[in-house]
Structures are given as structure tokens and as C-alpha cells.
Amino acid sequence: MDASEGQVDIFLQPGELFVGDAGWRIRTLLGSCVSITLWHPASRLGGMSHFLLPSRGSPRLLGQGLDGRYGDEALQAMLEDFERAGVRPVQCQAKIFGGGNMFPGQSRAGAMQVGQRNGEAARALLCEYGIPVVGESLFGFGHRQIIFDVDAGDVWSCQVAPGSSDTASDELAQGVWP
């Protein structure tokens, strides 16, 4: 698709990922989940994951495919798509979003929240693959609306605290750009 014709929006549900060219704009809504965006500036190829947990916690069974619900497998699946397009992981730029605490005041003292674990896992995975992280918006309280313009490599993030007005997030969802 020619980007001059306009971009096509795709919305990721939890456990989904997408890799596409400049003709796409990828959106998602995150709470404690985390999204990793990858962008290759020269080819304007980009991808986004929306994972729920850092890893499966047990080995995959023989013949079992990669599962986008898990950060390690979601990143591996995205990197395989990039490699099929001739892009090596270290040629990409990464940004990380999400990991919010959705239930402040309901945590045990000293216990790491799932959002915190997800964000730390994303950082570690990208470091392991040698992919530079050029931006992040992690942790805090509440959810985030994320919009990734693959053509430009720009990612917009709007964080809304629990119980707050969601006006800014609603505007982003309707296509009102910052």
C-alpha cells in the first residue's frame, strides 16, 4: 500500500502482534500489559506486540507455536517477521510502553506487580538481542492508549490514572493527534 493513500489502522488485542510497512498505524490499549514497538528507519517497517506476561513459565511443547501473550515469544515472533523482510534485530529501534499498576493500594508490600515484571522483562529482552531502546513510557498508575505511526516511526502514548477523566485517551482513540 502506498502511504500517500492514507494509513490503515489496526487495533491489537492482548496477546496479538503485528508487523507491517508504512501503510499501517497500529493501536492498542495497555494496563499492566506491555507493548514493544520495533521500527526500521530505512525500510519504514514497524511492529508492535501486546503481551500479558514476561514468559510462559514452562517450556513450549514440541510443535507448539510462539504465543504473543508472553513477552519473550512475542518479541521472537516479531523478530522472525523482520528477518523475513531482511532486517536484522540490531538495525531496529525499540520503544517500550505500559506496565501500569491498575490496582493501587491493593498490593502486598515488597511484591513486584505484574506490570513491573512485564516492563523489566521487555528491557532485558531488548538488551539480550542488542536492540537499542530509544524511548519508553513505563509503570505508574492506570492505563495507556498507544498509537504507532509506522510511516514516521512515531509512537504516541497517553496515560490515564485510575478514576481520572479519560478525555485525552478518547481523543486519541478518535484520531485526534497531539
Segments the model singles out, each with a brief description of its role:
Residues 1-33, 43, 49-59, 67-91, ...:
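Short acidic-hydrophobic catalytic motif
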